[in-house]
């Protein structure tokens, strides 16, 4: 199961995901929504967990920023930082995620564990 949790506005998030990942079926695509606190508040992750009925222990939260690592920690899920995003590796390391990867193939390996 794949889902998106973004701090971009909801309409922009949906548009970007549809454009860049047209062949991937996401269970949920959430951006900023009225009345919902933005990350690192864990509400968006909790909303996804409610929809998917997946336990926190089975989640790998993949992100490219310290805010993402904080969100994962706040939600009680496993964090995986990716080094090809907008923030430097050092920012990810500050939050001590369970994993930091340098390429997408490594995510599949971690998810299979």
Task: Label each region the model flagged.
Residues 10, 14-113:
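Asp-based, Mg2+/Mn2+-dependent phosphohydrolase catalytic module
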Residues 6-8:
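Conserved phosphate-coupling serine/threonine residues in phosphotransfer and NTP-handling enzymes
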């Amino acid at each position: 199961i794949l889902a998106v949790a973004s701090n971009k506005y909801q309409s922009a998030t949906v548009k970007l995901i549809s454009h860049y990942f047209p062949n991937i079926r996401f269970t949920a695509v959430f951006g900023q929504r009225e009345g919902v606190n933005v990350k690192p508040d864990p509400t968006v992750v909790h909303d996804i967990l409610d929809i998917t009925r997946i336990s926190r222990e089975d989640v790998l939260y993949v992100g490219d920023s310290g805010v993402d690592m904080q969100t994962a920690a706040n939600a009680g899920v496993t964090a995986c930082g990716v080094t090809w995003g907008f923030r430097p590796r050092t920012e990810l390391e500050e939050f001590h995620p369970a994993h930091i990867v340098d390429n997408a193939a490594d995510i599949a390996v971690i998810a299979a564990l």
